[in-house]
């Protein structure tokens, strides 16, 4: 279930959302405490974190997922050190991708206008700042180099190379460098 996928404002501190995130954060810590010499245990934990995961997927670690369950990873994909995924809504990653160290995928957004960033009343009667989220999609056979940040609403087409240090603010057509 993609609770935050409609682009509408939501309260990230709703009790049920916090419960999911705390569970995922605990699993992140568990995964990160294991060494690469414990592949079976790491595999079990990462499968608990992710919504879907294909075959032959490897996360070097450490990893940080926000929800985890909103992320789907295809087959034969490698993630180097320090992969961060703020998956407040859907993140899909295709087959045969490589991610360099320190890659961040972010789906949440806060309003751009100052008046819209003020605290609003949540369903539980507590005033909080709201946010919204836009999905991120990475196609097949992509290479996302070191220190790349992919921002909300971006689609990276099949066969792309995103150069080291890039901040991806807009969608990228297939087979682009």
Each PLM stretch: what is its role?
Residues 1-56, 112:
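Terminal amphipathic alpha-helical/low-complexity segments used for targeting or macromolecular assembly
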Residues 2, 49, 128, 134-135, ...:
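Short secondary-structure boundary/capping segments
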Residues 8, 101, 146, 164-166:
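Gly/Ser/Thr-rich helix-start
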Residues 35-36, 67, 87, 172:
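Residues at alpha-helix boundaries and short interhelical turns
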Residues 54, 98, 173:
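Short conserved AdoMet
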Residues 63-73, 78-155:
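Flexible, glycine/small-residue-enriched loop-and-beta-strand segment within the central core
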Residues 149-177:
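C-terminal/domain-terminus segments
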């Amino acid at each position: 279930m993609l609770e935050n996928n409609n682009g509408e404002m939501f309260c990230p501190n709703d009790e049920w959302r916090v419960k999911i995130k705390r569970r995922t954060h605990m699993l992140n810590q568990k995964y990160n405490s294991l060494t690469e010499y414990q592949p079976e245990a790491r595999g079990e934990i990462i499968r608990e974190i992710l919504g879907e995961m294909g075959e032959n997927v490897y996360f070097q670690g450490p990893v940080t997922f926000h929800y985890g369950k909103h992320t789907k990873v295809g087959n034969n994909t490698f993630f180097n050190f320090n992969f961060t995924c703020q998956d407040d809504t859907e993140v899909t990653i295709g087959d045969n991708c490589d991610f360099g160290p320190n890659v961040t995928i972010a789906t949440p957004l806060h309003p751009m206008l100052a008046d819209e960033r003020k605290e609003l009343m949540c369903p539980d009667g507590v005033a909080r700042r709201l946010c919204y989220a836009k999905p991120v999609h990475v196609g097949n056979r992509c290479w996302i180099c070191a220190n790349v940040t992919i921002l909300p609403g971006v689609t990276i087409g099949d066969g792309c190379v995103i150069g080291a240090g890039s901040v991806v603010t807009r969608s990228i057509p297939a087979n682009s460098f």
